[in-house]
């Protein structure tokens, strides 16, 4: 190795040190890594120092495994390297290896027995180890005791339930889960499952879920010990709670095996086998379940839900969609089979009311996960071949299975469904089945017809070919189920023009008659939920017409009946309810109509959409008020809690739109909060489409801006509100969103330090500072008010202390603005900053020459609040620096202080008068003035 290379390693080490001191940890690691490569292997001492330094970097990055490894390499060279020993101790502690951390700090304390840091760490680790040993021994006995109670013939049911619940709670803690696992827990839990008692099965499954959470090695051992087929057979039982608990266990296993386990095991990692085979086996087992006759409806739903959640890519930027392609190859036909099931026919798979829709959602997710046209072509060909294979002129049951499968596809990837519906003979088959004598044929055909007429082109086909047939079915059939579906078909065809007043498909008044019948069925409690659901489907289409939505908003019993149905077990209703509410509140996106463009379109004989008179602002406001009175907020809160497989991102976006429309009027926000609207908005703001999250965040901001956040978002939920509000501060968002987000954050920042720290962690500070420079008066005022509440934080104060920026100058100049609310906020921030940091009291005199003039204006302001803030700032300056105090007393400020201090006591101005008197007392204490004597 040349002298140049040796010099390089020293230079790189020095460069790394500079980066570390500047807080540039990644660059420091790069420099140290290069230094290690260029350093001479024989120069062990130099290498040890570099490893020790890199260990400090890894500690900062919370990469504790690498930190321990580098510290060990330094200790191998010099066993008495006290810095390396202490760094390894810190890393071991974070990795949970308390005994090894204790040994390292013990050696540190031996080398430097008077070092308080080492002695404190030694004492703390000793106490933690003792506590851990105590917990371990007590946990072992508790685990054994619980199993004894569960396996005994204990007649006290309450005692057994308590033991089962304790076991579940214990399994959720890592130490408890490990003790259960080590004490032969898995075979004992399997014995509990084999008792066949539902409460015992639930307890065992939930305990296993806790043991598998976040621990890959344990999850692998459990899945091999219990067996995937055994777990599938448990999930297949006809018990909703057991099916749900087993699905949760599968999810915990999947998360742990696919990287949800965030721990770093170092060398122990080598003992864990590759988990890809286990994940593949689970996927195949779930695909087998969905088309098996031995699986209950609840079990099938959960298998479909697991596939929906885990097969498509979580991050669309990833190019690996192999799981999706594997699922299509091995399971697409099975999913299509589920979609095609007709419950009214014999020999069908057991299903719940939600099964077909969950299968449709899965189809949609799989189709969306495909990356190129050849993949989509393969998907389409499999669906096409499956439907064609079911068409049989001699077997009507097979035909309706094919049409029902198409219905399922139309409810999922509808673009694909529209292509398949356009195949030769498919539409004709639907129309022919509508005229069949069998009621089940009519039922399936009408449903397919409704789903197929999504596009105006398809609707036109049905308007010319199917309207008379639907009218005939509606008039002649005595079966309410068919009657209502025929009506919905007519509703959908009648709404094919959307909200365009000039594109009505039917004659004036026809849609109102259809809607009236839908409302009548909706309010009929003797009809089953599924039939009444179709009445809402009809309204979802018809409420595109402003006359219909206005009539519906005036029919309070119909609205209440719809809201009540959202609480039923059939959650397939949610999309239709959301559509109806979006239509009633007009919360869909509307393009801005430019009069010149309208004239141009008319001149060129292009169609121009017309607004219905009842779609104007005052009508919308009236409808919103009626919806709130009928209890729409409670219904929305229930809908938000639905399972994600049913509550799709599109449905969430619609709910967010409705919430935003409801919160428009400040007077209505209290009712929304009282009915749980604040809590319901949080998940909508955190998950869903980008547009939906923004709408929900805006609604949250409107509530947070005017309500007490502790009441609107009780408990820990309040901390979840911060991120959605910060997302509205981007410069790409419109001014109203910026303004209301700032007002909401101001309210939150005024509550406690924890919330202020959370706002800073979400990187809101640069955005808030940016808006303090905004030209728009209200946005600038809101940003300044928010900053006024944030300056209590040390981190914010430090930013004002930094040189090379105009933050403090801006604050001083804002105090001189004419707008009172802006002045009050800026003066408040200045008063708090100068109270917290004396250096800032001196610095403010250097940032602008106008500081004294502005301060004097504050101290003689007509508004007592602003005057008080100005006088507090003067007091802080008198207290901060003798020279500054002298300068203030020699100016006109003394005259102002004397005038205010001599005012008679006045409740409205008392704070300002007291502050002025305190300033004079301070000046007297400093020997700058003397008391007046006769």
From Swiss-Prot:
Keywords: Chaperone, Cytoplasm, Developmental protein, Differentiation, Myogenesis, Repeat, TPR repeat. GO terms for biological process: cardiac muscle tissue development; chaperone-mediated protein folding; lens development in camera-type eye; muscle cell development; myofibril assembly; skeletal muscle organ development; skeletal muscle tissue development; striated muscle cell development. One of its GO terms (molecular function) is Hsp90 protein binding. TPR repeats lie at residues 9-42, 48-81, 83-115. Expressed in striated muscle tissue including somites, heart and craniofacial muscle. Detected in mesoderm adjacent to the dorsal midline during the late gastrula stages and in somitic mesoderm during development of trunk skeletal muscle. Also expressed in cranial skeletal muscle and in cardiac and smooth muscle. Detected in somitic muscle and heart primordium of 24 hour embryos. At later stages, expressed in muscles of pectoral fins, jaw, branchial arches and eye. SUPFAM superfamilies: ARM repeat, TPR-like. It comes from the Eukaryota. It is found in: Cytoplasm, Myofibril, Sarcomere, Z line; Cytoplasm, Myofibril, Sarcomere, A band; Cytoplasm, Perinuclear region. Gene3D superfamilies: Leucine-rich Repeat Variant, Tetratricopeptide repeat domain. ARM repeats lie at residues 174-213, 216-255, 753-792. One of its GO terms (cellular component) is Z disc. Acts as a co-chaperone for HSP90 and is required for proper folding of the myosin motor domain. Plays a role in sarcomere formation during muscle cell development. Required for myoseptal integrity, myofiber attachment, motility and craniofacial development. Is necessary for normal early lens development. Interacts with apobec2a, apobec2b, hsp90a.1, hsp90a.2, hsp90ab1 and myosin. This is Protein unc-45 homolog B. It comes from Danio rerio. The gene is unc45b.
């Amino acid at each position: 190795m040349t002298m140049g290379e040796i010099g390089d390693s020293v230079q790189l080490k020095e460069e790394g040190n500079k980066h570390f001191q500047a807080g540039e940890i990644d660059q420091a690691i790069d420099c140290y890594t290069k230094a290690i490569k260029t350093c001479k292997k024989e120069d062990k001492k130099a290498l040890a120092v570099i490893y020790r330094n890199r260990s400090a970097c890894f500690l900062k990055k919370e990469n504790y495994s690498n930190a321990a490894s580098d510290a060990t390499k330094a200790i191998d060279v010099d066993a008495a390297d006290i810095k390396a020993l202490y760094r390894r101790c810190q890393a071991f502690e974070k990795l949970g290896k308390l005994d090894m951390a204790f040994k390292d700090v013990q050696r540190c304390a031996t080398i430097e027995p008077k070092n308080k840091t080492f002695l404190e760490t030694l004492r703390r680790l000793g106490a933690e180890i003792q506590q851990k040993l105590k917990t371990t021994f007590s946990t072992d006995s508790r685990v054994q005791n619980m199993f004894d109670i569960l396996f005994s013939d204990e007649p006290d049911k309450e005692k057994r339930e308590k033991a089962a619940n304790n076991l579940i709670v214990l399994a959720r803690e890592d130490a408890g889960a490990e003790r259960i696992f080590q004490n032969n827990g898995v075979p004992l839990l399997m014995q509990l499952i084999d008792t066949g008692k539902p409460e015992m099965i639930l307890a065992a499954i939930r305990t296993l879920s806790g043991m598998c959470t976040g621990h890959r090695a344990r999850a692998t051992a459990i899945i091999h010990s219990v067996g995937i087929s055994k777990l599938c057979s448990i999930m297949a039982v006809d018990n909703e709670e057991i099916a749900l608990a087993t699905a949760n266990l599968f999810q915990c296993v999947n998360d742990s095996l696919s990287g949800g386990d965030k721990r770093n095991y170092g060398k122990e990692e080598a003992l864990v086998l590759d988990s890809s085979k286990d994940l593949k086996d689970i996927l195949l087992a779930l695909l087998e379940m969905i088309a098996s006759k031995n699986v209950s409806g609840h079990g099938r739903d959960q298998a479909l839900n697991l596939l929906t959640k885990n097969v498509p890519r979580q991050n669309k930027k990833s190019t690996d969609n192999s799981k999706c392609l594997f699922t299509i190859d091995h399971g697409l036909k099975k999913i299509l089979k589920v979609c095609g099931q007709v419950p009214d026919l014999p020999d069908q798979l057991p299903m719940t009311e939600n099964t077909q829709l969950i299968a449709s959602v899965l189809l949609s997710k799989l189709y969306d996960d495909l990356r190129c046209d050849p993949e989509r072509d393969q998907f389409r060909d499999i669906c096409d071949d499956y439907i064609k294979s079911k068409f049989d002129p001699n077997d009507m049951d097979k035909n309706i299975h094919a049409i029902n499968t198409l219905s399922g596809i139309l409810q999922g990837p509808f673009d694909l469904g529209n292509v398949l519906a356009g195949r030769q003979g498919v539409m004709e088959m639907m129309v022919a089945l509508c005229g069949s004598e069998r009621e089940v044929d009519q039922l399936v055909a009408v449903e397919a017809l409704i789903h197929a007429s999504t596009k105006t082109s398809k609707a036109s086909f049905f308007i010319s070919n199917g309207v008379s047939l639907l009218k005939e079915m509606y008039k002649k059939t005595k079966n309410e189920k068919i009657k209502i579906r025929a009506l919905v078909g007519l509703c959908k065809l009648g709404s094919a023009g959307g909200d365009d007043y000039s594109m009505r498909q039917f004659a004036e008044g026809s849609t109102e008659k259809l809607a009236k019948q839908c409302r009548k069925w909706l309010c009929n409690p003797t009809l089953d939920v599924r039939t009444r659901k179709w009445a809402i489907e009809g309204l979802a289409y018809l409420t595109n017409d402003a006359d219909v939505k206005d009539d519906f908003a005036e029919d309070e019993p119909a609205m209440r009946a719809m809201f009540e149905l959202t609480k039923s077990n059939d959650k397939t209703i949610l999309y239709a309810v959301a559509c109806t509410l979006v239509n009633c509140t007009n919360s869909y996106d509307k393009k801005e109509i430019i009069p010149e463009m309208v004239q141009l379109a008319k001149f060129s004989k292009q169609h121009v959409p017309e607004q219905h008179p009842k779609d104007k602002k005052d009508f919308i406001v009236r409808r919103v008020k009626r919806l709130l009175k009928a209890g729409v907020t409670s219904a929305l809160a229930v809908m938000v809690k639905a399972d994600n497989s049913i509550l799709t991102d599109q449905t969430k976006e619609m709910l967010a739109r409705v919430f935003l429309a409801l919160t428009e009027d400040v007077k209505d926000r209290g009712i929304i909060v009282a009915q749980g609207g604040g809590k319901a908005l949080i998940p909508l703001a955190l998950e869903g489409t980008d547009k939906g999250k923004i709408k929900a965040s805006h609604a949250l901001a409107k509530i947070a801006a005017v309500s007490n956040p502790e009441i609107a978002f009780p408990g820990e939920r309040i901390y979840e509100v911060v991120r959605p509000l910060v997302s509205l501060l981007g410069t790409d968002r419109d001014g109203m969103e910026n303004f209301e987000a700032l007002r909401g954050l101001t309210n939150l920042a005024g509550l406690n330090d924890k919330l202020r720290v959370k706002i800073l962690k979400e990187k809101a500070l640069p955005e808030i500072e940016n808006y303090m420079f905004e030209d728009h008066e209200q946005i600038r005022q809101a940003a300044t008010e928010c900053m006024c509440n944030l300056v209590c934080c040390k981190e914010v104060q430090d930013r004002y202390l930094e040189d090379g920026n105009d933050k403090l100058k801006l604050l001083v100049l804002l105090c001189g603005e004419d707008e009172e609310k802006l002045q009050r906020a800026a003066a408040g921030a200045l008063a708090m900053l100068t109270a917290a940091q004396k250096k800032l009291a001196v610095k403010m005199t250097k940032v602008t020459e106008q500081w004294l003039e502005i301060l004097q204006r504050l101290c003689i302001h007509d508004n007592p609040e602003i005057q008080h803030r100005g006088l507090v700032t003067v007091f802080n300056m008198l207290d901060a620096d003798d020279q500054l105090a002298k300068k203030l007393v020699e100016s006109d400020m003394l005259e102002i202080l004397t005038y205010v201090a001599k005012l008679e006591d006045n409740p409205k101005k008392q704070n300002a008068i007291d502050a002025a008197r305190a300033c004079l007392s301070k000046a007297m204490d400093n020997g700058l003035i003397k008391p007046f004597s006769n």
